[in-house]
Amino acid sequence: MDMKNMREYMSWLYYQYLLITGIYVLEPWEQSIFNTVLFTMVAMVIYTSYVFVPIHVRLALEFFCELVGGQPESTVALMT
């Protein structure tokens, strides 16, 4: 894909973003505030997922392992 097609594609994606969110009717300063708030919220969701999802997955795995009769990690560590 050459640079002209890539630029046109990115321009088309940005146009779709403007239409889907409805911010094409806003003034430029309102668009920048909206984009800042949206970017901040997306960044917070990504950061929170990065920090807390692994913890919850580990706890869920421990819970389900105990349900099916597996030994907890502390018991296995003591036996060796």
Curated annotation (Swiss-Prot):
Localization: Endoplasmic reticulum membrane
Transmembrane annotation, as ranges: 12-29, 37-57
Pathway the protein acts in: Lipid metabolism; sphingolipid metabolism
This protein's GO CC annotations: endoplasmic reticulum membrane; serine palmitoyltransferase complex
GO biological process: ceramide biosynthetic process; endoplasmic reticulum organization; sphingolipid biosynthetic process
Keywords: Endoplasmic reticulum, Lipid metabolism, Membrane, Sphingolipid metabolism, Transmembrane, Transmembrane helix
Cytoplasmic topological domain residue ranges: 1-11, 58-80
A family per Pfam: SPT_ssu-like
Main location: endoplasmic reticulum
Subunit structure: Component of the serine palmitoyltransferase (SPT) complex, which is composed of SPTLC1, SPTLC2 or SPTLC3 and SPTSSA or SPTSSB. The heterodimer consisting of SPTLC1 and SPTLC2/SPTLC3 forms the catalytic core of the enzyme, while SPTSSA or SPTSSB subunits determine substrate specificity. SPT also interacts with ORMDL proteins, especially ORMDL3, which negatively regulate SPT activity in the presence of ceramides.
Function: Component of the serine palmitoyltransferase multisubunit enzyme (SPT) that catalyzes the initial and rate-limiting step in sphingolipid biosynthesis by condensing L-serine and activated acyl-CoA (most commonly palmitoyl-CoA) to form long-chain bases. The SPT complex is composed of SPTLC1, SPTLC2 or SPTLC3 and SPTSSA or SPTSSB. Within this complex, the heterodimer consisting of SPTLC1 and SPTLC2/SPTLC3 forms the catalytic core. Within the SPT complex, SPTSSB stimulates the catalytic activity and plays a role in substrate specificity.
Annotated protein name in UniProt: Serine palmitoyltransferase small subunit B
Organism: Danio rerio
